[in-house]
């Protein structure tokens, strides 16, 4: 019958809590929701793979024992940070955090499709079944293996189409049935994009990461999607905050990261020793006078 829909679909079925048990492993399998035919009818397909992106958010792991425990952030390629497309929905919206997202492919048909979210140009994909191991977080990232170009994570699909259930036998008589209608839907291949983190049983603001104290624009983007589908274009046109994205060059970070890390550690120490030496020399000269 048409209408407005938001789909937030996990292409992967995985127990995330298993990552933090003794083995530090979890198994990713295809998520079977019996929606493949429906999405194919609308001209999109959620692939049975998992995106790994060089431009990613960290995962925070505990290091040490008892009172000496420290929480250390490590880049986690399964947490892509997405820059929204410059559309009426994504305009003036900051970076969005995705978790365990799958690529979306489009299929040619008469419906209109507009790209809303996509990964960076430095990715690779994992086929299912896949083993997700936390040891990967502490291993050195090899940028040379991230050779695939960007993959779509969200599309707006709109148009007028026949129902997937056309010509099927109805379980009961329904006089108001319409087999063709106008519709708009947003499909997102990440069911975690609208998931709040929980702290002491209380849900935190959507987009806030309690482990890194970072704020992402998940909430603002989802609100924009809802306003767009509800026809509230005035709300979207009056937004005026500008975001300037400055992504790091991952290849340079991996090449020179160790040098700058040790420089930042040792340089203050060397400056401190030099300052003590100079002040000691000045003090000795003053005592001799």
Label each residue range with its predicted role:
Residues 257-281:
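Selective detector of the "anchor" transmembrane alpha-helix that sits immediately C-terminal
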Residues 1-234:
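Acidic, S/T/G-rich, low-cysteine, solvent-exposed domains in lumenal/extracellular/periplasmic regions
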């Amino acid at each position: 019958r048409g209408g407005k829909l938001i789909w937030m679909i996990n292409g992967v079925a995985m127990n995330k809590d298993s990552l933090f048990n003794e083995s530090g492993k979890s198994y990713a399998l295809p998520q079977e929701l019996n929606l493949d035919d429906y999405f194919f009818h609308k001209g999109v397909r959620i692939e049975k793979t998992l995106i790994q992106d060089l431009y990613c958010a960290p995962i925070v792991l505990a290091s040490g024992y008892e009172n000496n425990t420290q929480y250390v952030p490590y880049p986690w390629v399964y947490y892509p940070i997405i820059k929204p497309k410059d559309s009426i929905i994504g305009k003036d919206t900051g970076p969005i955090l995705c978790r365990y997202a799958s690529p979306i492919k489009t299929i040619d048909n008469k419906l209109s499709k507009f790209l809303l979210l996509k990964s960076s140009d430095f990715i690779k994909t994992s086929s299912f079944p896949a083993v997700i191991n936390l040891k990967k977080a502490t291993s050195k990232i090899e940028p040379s293996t991230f050779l695939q170009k960007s993959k779509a994570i969200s599309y707006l699909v709109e148009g007028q189409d026949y129902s997937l259930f056309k010509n099927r036998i109805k379980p009961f008589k329904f006089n108001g049935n319409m087999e063709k209608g106008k519709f708009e839907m947003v499909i997102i291949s990440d069911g975690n994009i609208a998931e709040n983190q929980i702290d002491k049983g209380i849900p935190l603001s959507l987009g806030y990461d309690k482990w890194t104290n970072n704020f992402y624009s998940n909430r603002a983007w989802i609100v924009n999607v809802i306003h767009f589908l509800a026809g509230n274009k005035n709300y979207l046109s009056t937004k005026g905050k500008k975001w300037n994205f400055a992504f790091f060059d991952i290849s340079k970070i991996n090449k020179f990261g160790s040098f700058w890390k040790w420089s930042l550690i040792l340089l203050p120490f060397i400056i401190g020793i030099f300052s003590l030496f100079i002040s000691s020399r000045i003090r000795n000269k003053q005592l001799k006078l």
